[in-house]
Swiss-Prot record:
Tree of life domain: Bacteria
Subcellular location(s) of the protein: Cytoplasm
A GO CC term assigned to this protein in UniProt: cytoplasm
Catalyzed reaction equations: N-acetyl-L-glutamate + ATP = N-acetyl-L-glutamyl 5-phosphate + ADP
Pathway, per record: Amino-acid biosynthesis; L-arginine biosynthesis; N(2)-acetyl-L-ornithine from L-glutamate: step 2/4
Keyword Nucleotide-binding: yes
Protein name: Acetylglutamate kinase
MF terms (GO), sorted A to Z: acetylglutamate kinase activity; ATP binding
Binding positions for substrate per the UniProt entry: G72, G73, R94, N199
Disulfide bond positions: none
UniProt gene name: argB
Amino acid sequence: MSQSDADALPNVHVRAEVLVQALPHMQRYDEEIVVIKYGGHAMGDRAAAEDFAEDIVLLEQSGLKPVIVHGGGPQIGRMLDRLGIKSEFREGLRVTDEATVEVVEMVLAGSINKQIVGWISAEGGKAIGLCGKDGNMVQARRATRTVVDPDSNIERHVDLGLVGEPERVNRAVLDAVLKAELIPVLAPVAVGSDGQTYNVNADTFAGAIAGALRAKRLLLLTDVPGVLDKDKKLIPELSIEDCRRLIADGTITGGMIPKIETCIYAIEQGVEAVVILDGKVPHAVLLELFTDYGAGTLIRRSGA
């Protein structure tokens, strides 16, 4: 044995320990569907994006059936600015008119979707890019939002334009893709019963897909470590009841509330558990699925 081989032995032992730890997790998820929502913010880091694609290919090669749903808010914003189209947000959602929805579809179902497919292909995977309109996979209805004025306590409706929420998922399209051993990469653009195109929030879209597929896990990759308590410390696990209590007492606020609502919906539709985790952490998906420690906040129907 050469000196260089001898020096490498400690690292080999560490890698062996990692593989031993990962094996039972791989067996647990064999042939199981895992839906992963990949946010637009994470795509800005090319190295992190390539790591993500590598992880997805490894999941597929390990026997899992990954389904990717991606966002693209920052990229949409930049394109709207470039085209001189003003954009407005209400209640955390982009108000979408006819001009905006054309840009949303172009960016999400076009450039971003194919970019992710390309990254996965470069790592040796076989991915196919689709949006909710393809095969009438996701039918949406116009989203409605009601807010309460804190001063008068009067409810008012917020018009979001062509923002949709999933009404029906045709899982036969996804079943066919998965049976062909392809990795679906889905853009959250859907169609209404009248043929109208709708911009759907990526978290909401991912929750509907996961629920329809009865996925083993739904992973929501975000730009925060997970759900935080009032001291800004990570909460490792929550039940649905815990989530509702933390919303009521003001611990969970702002943009985390719709994410939690998506988690609750998905679990009630049959998803075993949902994890909110930081997509900027290298190999966060593998850490969550294939290690004893996990990553982020695990949400399930009831406490362990």
